[in-house]
């Protein structure tokens, strides 16, 4: 083997190793045990506090890793349609292991991002976040009732506090 071909082989192996490590670093968290009812009740508190601080009325849902409802709360004067939307956002974040804003951004980008529309259960609107404990997804939170950015702000407050 010549020096040139040896260097190419080493460069190829290094490129593959870097690409693989990048892909592994971006892999979503694995699923863990389901969030408890007590922890689900605690998880919604930062979202509700963020909404109250800003005079927003929201509905908040927490689901387990399989997308089953664990806890739900709706503030007074929240639009009625937000009840199911909050559950759908939470379920989407749990089942697809990512914030729902990722789908919103993919859809907004157009092109291949339009494939989001064919994913059953994917909600392309900000406001859903996985809940992570010890590096594992134990559930997800969904918020609806304000603008999608405001819903996301509330849900993120809960997801960040939950870690």
Regions found by a protein language model. Name each.
Residues 1-13:
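Bacterial N-terminal signal peptides that target proteins for export
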């Amino acid at each position: 083997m010549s020096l040139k071909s040896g260097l190419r082989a080493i460069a190829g192996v290094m490129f593959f190793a870097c690409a693989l490590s990048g892909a592994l670093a971006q892999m979503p968290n694995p699923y863990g045990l389901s969030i408890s009812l007590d922890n689900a009740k605690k998880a919604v508190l930062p979202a509700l506090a963020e909404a109250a601080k800003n005079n927003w009325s929201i509905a908040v849902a927490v689901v387990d890793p399989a997308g089953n409802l664990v806890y739900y709360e709706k503030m007074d004067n929240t639009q009625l349609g937000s009840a199911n939307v909050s559950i759908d956002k939470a379920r989407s974040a749990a089942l697809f292991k990512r914030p729902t804003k990722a789908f919103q951004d993919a859809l907004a980008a157009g092109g291949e991002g339009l494939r989001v529309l064919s994913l059953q259960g994917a909600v392309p609107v900000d406001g859903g976040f996985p809940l992570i404990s010890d590096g594992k997804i134990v559930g997800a939170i969904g918020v609806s009732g304000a603008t999608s950015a405001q819903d996301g702000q509330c849900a993120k407050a809960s997801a960040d506090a939950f870690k």
